């Protein structure tokens, strides 16, 4: 596998296929989201705002959880991991997209494309696993509150976090290896705005069935399996909440779980649409719009959803702001 990657680095390395000479692709060209100049300027402004909100929002969540001792609980430990994953997820794609809005020729090197896919899949698949872990945490908190502290220990939280990142790394390694094991000769124009396996496979010079099946199998592992766990957890949560006598307890449970459920629907819905259906020979505009949703919009919405619907996070923010105001007065 490594030797195959090394042979791709030669600029315009010549090979022979039958009687016809072809060249290995050394870089890819994106068609982007639009070819219209005015539309690209508007998209640049929109994506810049989204990216700034993503960075500021997720960094704020990470800082608040680190500084406020009241947020040193399993739920916020996993939320901090999720915010970090969102930050890496968006940063692996959006800055390059912003640059491409300002230039006529939108290119990326072969190795740059490979690196982008590795990071994108690593943090994206890790986020899938983290959302499943967070649903299990909510299940234990709502359905087994008396055993919560003994089940969700620090050691268990660290282990679940490690397994989430390890599963993301495994899926990233498998999908990237299968994608770049294929030969890419001659054609190098990607009808997309970043390197994503389904779009890249359309340029492969041989049949991609085995690679598509490998990516589909990994999708089952990292998308459908966690979704099944999430659905099972929420089925038990809803059953428990309905039986609660306290109206305040019901409201608190639905508020806490509601934020997580919104994030799950947004992220998994778009991910399953892209990776769990047959790969067509052409990239449709709808495919690119769905990709925008989970690469740019969802990472921006996550901190907003969790902070606006969470009293603890809002309390930590008020405490931090009050501390800053007090220090300025002194």
UniProtKB/Swiss-Prot annotation:
Query: Which portions of this protein are annotated as coiled-coil regions?
Result: none
| Keywords tagged on the record | Cell membrane, G-protein coupled receptor, Glycoprotein, Membrane, Olfaction, Receptor, Sensory transduction, Transducer, Transmembrane, Transmembrane helix
**CDD domains from the xrefs?**
7tmA_OR2D-like
Alphabetical list of SUPFAM superfamilies matching this protein: Family A G protein-coupled receptor-like
Establish whether keyword Oxidoreductase is in the entry.
no
Glycosylation site list: 21
Regions that span the bilayer: 42-65, 74-95, 117-136, 156-174, 212-235, 253-275, 289-308
Cellular compartments annotated:
Cell membrane
User: One Pfam family for this entry, by name?
Assistant: 7tm_4
Provide the Gene Ontology terms for cellular component.
Answer: plasma membrane
Residues in compartment: Cytoplasmic = 66-73, 137-155, 236-252, 309-330
Topological domains, Extracellular: 1-41, 96-116, 175-211, 276-288
Database matches in InterPro entries: GPCR_Rhodpsn (IPR000276), GPCR_Rhodpsn_7TM (IPR017452), Olfact_rcpt (IPR000725)
Q: What GO biological process, any one, is recorded here?
A: detection of chemical stimulus involved in sensory perception of smell
How this chain sits in the membrane, per its record, is: Multi-pass membrane protein
Molecular function via GO: G protein-coupled receptor activity; olfactory receptor activity
Its annotated function is as follows: Odorant receptor.
Family classification: Belongs to the G-protein coupled receptor 1 family.
Name of this protein:
Olfactory receptor 2D3
- Please tell me the species this chain comes from: Homo sapiens (Human)
């Amino acid at each position: 596998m490594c030797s195959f990657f090394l042979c791709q680095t030669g600029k315009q390395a010549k090979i022979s296929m039958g009687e016809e000479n072809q060249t290995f692709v050394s870089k890819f060209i994106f068609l982007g989201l639009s070819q219209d100049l005015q539309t690209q300027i508007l998209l640049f402004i929109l994506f810049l705002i989204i990216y700034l909100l993503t960075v500021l929002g997720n960094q704020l969540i990470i800082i608040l959880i680190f500084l406020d001792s009241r947020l040193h609980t399993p739920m916020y430990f996993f939320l901090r991991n999720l915010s970090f994953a969102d930050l890496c997820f968006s940063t692996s794609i959006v800055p390059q997209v912003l640059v491409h809005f300002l230039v006529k020729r939108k290119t990326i090197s072969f190795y740059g494309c490979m690196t982008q896919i590795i990071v994108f899949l690593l943090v994206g698949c890790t986020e899938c696993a983290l959302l499943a872990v967070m649903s299990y945490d909510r299940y234990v908190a709502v359905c087994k509150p008396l055993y919560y502290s003994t089940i969700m220990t620090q050691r268990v939280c660290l282990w679940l976090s490690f397994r989430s990142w390890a599963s993301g790394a495994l899926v990233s390694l498998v999908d990237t290896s299968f994608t770049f094991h294929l030969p890419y000769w001659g054609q190098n124009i990607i009808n997309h705005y970043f390197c994503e396996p389904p779009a890249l496979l359309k340029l492969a010079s041989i049949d991609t069935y085995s690679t598509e099946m490998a990516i589909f199998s990994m999708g089952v592992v990292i998308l459908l399996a966690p979704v099944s766990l999430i659905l099972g957890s929420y089925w038990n949560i809803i059953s428990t909440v309905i039986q609660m006598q306290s109206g305040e307890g019901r409201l608190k449970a639905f508020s806490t779980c509601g934020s997580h459920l919104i994030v799950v629907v947004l992220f998994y819905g778009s991910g399953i649409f892209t990776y769990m259906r047959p790969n067509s020979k052409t990239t449709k505009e709808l495919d690119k719009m769905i990709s925008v949703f989970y690469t740019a919009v969802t990472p921006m919405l996550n901190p907003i959803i969790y902070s606006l619907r969470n009293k603890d996070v809002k309390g930590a923010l008020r405490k931090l702001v009050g501390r800053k105001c007090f220090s300025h007065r002194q």
